Amino acid sequence: MAIINMSELDLQGKRVLIREDLNVPVSDGVVTSDARLRAALPTIKLALEKGAAVMVMSHLGRPTEGEFNAEFSLQPVVNYLTKALECPVRLANDYLDGVEANVGELVVFENVRFNVGEKKNDEALAKKLAALCDVYVMDAFGTAHRAQASTHGVGLHAPVACAGPLLAGELEALGKAMDNPARPLVAIVGGSKVSTKLTVLESLSGIVDQLVVGGGIANTFIAAAGHEVGKSLYEANLIEEAKRLVANAQSRGGDIPVPTDVVVAGEFSPTASATLKDVSEVTSDDMIFDIGPDSAEALSEILKNAGTIVWNGPVGVFEFDQFGEGTKRIAQAIAESDAFSIAGGGDTLAAVDKYDIADKVSYISTGGGAFLEFLEGKELPAVAMLESRGE
């Protein structure tokens, strides 16, 4: 990939515009989870250290384009960055027709989604953004799968377009896991529906040695294996699809193992009592919310012997502790494995935090949708743009 990396450039005195993913949860004007901000800080600090006049832009939430809405303002992010950085930080509301940016300070543009044409990748808007800088830095892997004015169009028109260290690191880690992985390659795909992750399952079943499915997705595979799933969340219309994916994996010497024991309850609630059952004993009234200890142990063994692990999605309703043991055991197995491991997606990162294994996972991806699209083998528009500008 012929992508220019920001770290290689001389930025002294240059106007540098960085697109970060600062889309963080905010409550009562305070940032409640700062993971994305912490991930973005090294890039911002590096640009400041290199003597640039640094401007940063991001979206936050889903406001109506063209309308200012205080609920989606980046002011709470500015407050956070002011404490995290040793330089002045200010919010710029009107910046499209020019903005003053000085070396030694950080200018944060107000929510890019307040601009009409952002989502449609409007060329006039992209050109206005490009005119504000000497160097455009795309560092937001979480939005690399969207061709929008601030993630794609601006890069086509800026004098120089490059990847920031965070984005470059994501691409390197994902490339290591997917392009030339140490074998066996094991992927864990959890989540509620097969339909939302069908293309990922399709793509992975053709390249991985073991594909572990969890959550509601696993229920469809349990049904496909001929077992009762009761009132569990599953997709009857995708049973044939599940059978085909299993056959596809097995034809390559791989497999999609189905749980042998499961944890069930009669209702979905934080106080529901958990019952352990053999998968053949599930009744029509049961709802499956987790894998049982035997299944978790078997999966742990697979993970222990893996060369590469890609994790996207929990294997149970881990938010409720009584249905979290399966995900906890998987998390521990990944932490104990010598494999190169990469974890991505919101629920997965919440599980990584809950079971405190962040420092034991080789790479934690900041992307949700972008992470999935990379696993599907899709071209990410922002990455394609950077490649075209790097040639």
Curated annotation (Swiss-Prot):
InterPro entries (alphabetical)? Phosphoglycerate_kinase (IPR001576), Phosphoglycerate_kinase_CS (IPR015911), Phosphoglycerate_kinase_N (IPR015824), Phosphoglycerate_kinase_sf (IPR036043)
Which annotated residues bind substrate? 21-23, 36, 59-62, 113, 146
What are the protein's UniProt keywords? ATP-binding, Cytoplasm, Glycolysis, Kinase, Nucleotide-binding, Transferase
Q: Is Cytoplasm one of the keywords?
A: yes
At the top level of its lineage, which domain of life is listed? Bacteria
Provide the protein's localization: Cytoplasm
Chief localization: cytoplasm
* Cellular component aspect of the GO annotation: cytosol
Family in the record: Belongs to the phosphoglycerate kinase family.
Q: What is this protein called?
A: Phosphoglycerate kinase
Instruction: Tell me what organism the protein belongs to.
Output: Shewanella sediminis (strain HAW-EB3)
